C-alpha cells in the first residue's frame, strides 16, 4: 500500500483530512499519526458563510444523495436516524449549492478521498461547526465520514473510505470521526478517484470535481 503503508510502519506520514487553517507553519496542531487524521481550526473564507444550518431534515424520510462528479456518479445512503444533525447540515449545504464545483483536494490511496472545501485548500468551512455524532457503527470500505479539527468541530468537509482501506486504519477512525452514510452505488467511481496521480501533499494533479449533488427522498 504505497504511502499509507510506509506511514503505518514508521509513524512519519501524517494523514491530513484538513478542515482548518493550513499555513506554512503548522504551529498549534495536535498531531495524530499513522492512519488517523489530523486537522486544525476552521477559518472564514471568501466562500458562502453561515452562522448555523437551517433545519431541513424531515422525519420519516429516507435520504440518499447522488454525488455527480466529473468522473461519474456516487450514490450514498445517509444515516439520518443515527446522525440527524450531521445529515441536516449536509442537506442544508447541498440546498445552498455550497458543494457545486468543489474539488477532491486530498486523495490518499488505500485510505480516503476527501472533498467539501470550496477553497480547494483544506482550510475552508461553512462558518459554523457541529458536534460529533459518534455511534456504535464502525468504519468499513466505502463509508462516508466527516473530517474534523478535533472533537465537535465538524464543518463541510467529508471523506469516503477506500475500498482497500486496511483494518488498522478503520480502527483508528472509529470513534473519532462521525459516520453519516455509506456508498451504495458508484463504487468504481470511488476507486477511479483513488487512483488519480497526486503530488506530495496528496492533492490530485488534475482536478476531480463535484459538479452537483442530488438529494433523493423516499
What are these regions (language model features)?
Residues 1-218:
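Cyclophilin-like peptidyl-prolyl cis-trans isomerases
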